[in-house]
Amino acid sequence: MMAGRRSWPAMATVLLALLVCLGELVDSKPQPSDEKASPDKHHRFSLSRYAKLANRLANPKLLETFLSKWIGDRGNRSVK
């Protein structure tokens, strides 16, 4: 009866793998608008490009802060 249930680390691994596979299907760069596009469309393209760049630059700092908060600084521990 217990053999049919999967452990939570296995389920988390499967979910993470599924998210990675789905992430590969999404375009990471916005497609540039053609020359005949309206000024509004050009503006939306440049705004989305700027937003993606800003998020890409900000996220490593956010992740580092999050990890240091929850994991802590393990390098400063002394062994007794």
UniProtKB/Swiss-Prot annotation:
Role played? Inhibits calcium transport into spermatozoa; it does not bind directly to calcium. Binds to calmodulin. Inhibits the growth of microorganisms. Seem to act as an antibiotic by permeabilizing the bacterial membrane.
- In the record, which residues are listed under signal peptide? 1-32
Q: Name one GO cellular component term.
A: extracellular space
Keyword Signal (UniProt):
yes
Question: What is a GO molecular function of this protein?
Answer: neuropeptide hormone activity
UniProt-recorded name of the protein: Caltrin
Per UniProt, the keywords (alphabetical) are: Antibiotic, Antimicrobial, Calcium, Calmodulin-binding, Signal
Q: Name one GO biological process term.
A: feeding behavior
Organism, as annotated? Bos taurus
This chain is encoded by the gene named: PYY2
